[in-house]
Amino acid sequence: MAKDIKFSADARESMVRGVDILADTVKVTLGPKGRNVVLEKAFGSPLITNDGVTIAKEIELEDHFENMGAKLVSEVASKTNDIAGDGTTTATVLTQAIVREGLKNVTAGANPIGIRRGIEAATTTAVEALKAVAQPVSGKEAIAQVAAVSSRSEKVGDYISEAMERVGNDGVITIEESRGMETELEVVEGMQFDRGYLSQYMVTDNEKMVADLENPFILITDKKISNIQDILPLLEEVLKTSRPLLIIADDVDGEALPTLVLNKIRGTFNVVAVKAPGFGDRRKAMLEDIAVLTGGTVITEDLGLELKDATMAALGQAAKVTVDKDNTVIVEGAGSSEAIANRVNLIKSQLETTTSEFDREKLQERLAKLAGGVAVIKVGAATETELKEMKLRIEDALNATRAAVEEGIVAGGGTALINVMDKVAALELDGDAATGRNIVLRALEEPVRQIAYNAGYEGSVIIDKLKNSAAGVGFNAATGEWVDMIATGIIDPVKVTRSALQNAASVAGLILTTEAVVATKPEPAAPAMPQGMDPGMMGGF
């Protein structure tokens, strides 16, 4: 397939046109007075959103060279979203500003490599300065404030802070669509896995069809139990305690299942059997998680353990277990807090090294189940369009809140970027590297300029006043007032701000040092069929 190639200034200018088209579309959404963008969908109603990364992903340009520029900025938004979960519009605005200023200087004869070196040095200095002024986030009220700023809704802020309080910072918080019009929070405390009872005769509540076990022992094994004799000694020991038993095994079949059911129906003792969750190596890991949580031991050949030799010491315990036809929930396992903390740290280290998105998701689920539970925010709205938009806002708010808890917060509304300009300006560089530093200094103003513009104010006037104000004092674009940003609750997670700047500088530097661009040549349009010819005649000879 033939290729089109452009060089030097021609190549860069083509890409920058794409950068500008995408950035101009996205940046109208920045700030409390940001506008919405309507996205056409192939099926269903259009999506109305102010989420930067969602808009960026939808943009596809006809010109191949311009499209490459747009896709690079879209990558900045996606990368920032992956790392910090928010700040995608800020990242896009910063990228455009660095590229635009950089291109002017490269066109005027500056060395792009020197400029890039200056951009990198200035970005590193700005990030260090941001981290130095970051304030930690703790407490339900502070968390609610961060979430409310990101979602533009105090109610959503309250839901997220309550969810994080209930399941912990490492807990899983999922966002689902509600069947009603109201948004609500539902929390499943304890460890839940998607396996239900093996027989409906094991239920303790025939109306709700659930089995509730109070203070049960828990047998955990990766073996199949077919012969009741394998576990008979253990059952006799449990029977003496008059406490219920939960069996988690690869399967329970053969004579074992009807024998257990018969004893349950007769009231000999309360027992429920469920299949082990997961498959393969993941099943082994999840069984070990359950064992750590409940203070038990996994009966497995990997450890040289046999069911017939198992003692009461191998059984786990919990305050309560609830089993329905689809799920099992273990509440307040009896495992030691030290063992659980060690297991959590092991999973966290695996999270840091994994490259698979699927593995990452499963590890996060395991981490949450060990850490405390799962919270579900069920989003309700009057229309499908409003529901989609609300769901995106809540996802952004949740990600921003997690980022804030992780690395702290700085003054919002672009104020923190203006406040670190003095540190960047003090960076001693010369030649083209100094030009790169100055490009970053100009770019640091751009988020404030755009927020002010979207709210109907003159950006340059706001920036001048901001530079002469005390650190932390900024412009509240929602009210038009000058306030202490953090005290007023106008805040940004430092992880979001620094990720936006780092990713913007990285991609902008690549665009400025581009000397050639290779794109696929458009295919010539197929010739139209001559008018009046009957398609059925073709090939009819």
UniProtKB/Swiss-Prot annotation:
Q: Which domain of life is it from?
A: Bacteria
Entry GO terms, CC: cytoplasm
Q: Does the keyword ATP-binding apply?
A: yes
Q: What keywords does the record list, in alphabetical order? A: ATP-binding, Chaperone, Cytoplasm, Isomerase, Nucleotide-binding
Any one GO molecular function term: isomerase activity
Q: Which PROSITE patterns match?
A: CHAPERONINS_CPN60
Q: Which SUPFAM superfamilies match?
A: GroEL apical domain-like, GroEL equatorial domain-like, GroEL-intermediate domain like
An example GO BP is:
protein refolding
What reaction is this protein's catalytic activity? Answer: ATP + H2O + a folded polypeptide = ADP + phosphate + an unfolded polypeptide
Q: Which residues form a coiled coil?
A: none
Keyword ATP-binding, does the record have it?
yes
Q: Which family does it belong to?
A: Belongs to the chaperonin (HSP60) family.
Give the function comment from the record.
Together with its co-chaperonin GroES, plays an essential role in assisting protein folding. The GroEL-GroES system forms a nano-cage that allows encapsulation of the non-native substrate proteins and provides a physical environment optimized to promote and accelerate protein folding.
Subunit and interaction comment: Forms a cylinder of 14 subunits composed of two heptameric rings stacked back-to-back. Interacts with the co-chaperonin GroES.
NCBIfam families on file: GroEL (TIGR02348), PRK00013.1 (NF000592), PRK12849.1 (NF009487), PRK12850.1 (NF009488), PRK12851.1 (NF009489)
Protein name (Swiss-Prot/TrEMBL): Chaperonin GroEL
What organism does this protein naturally occur in?
Streptococcus equi subsp. zooepidemicus (strain H70)
- By which gene is this protein encoded? groEL
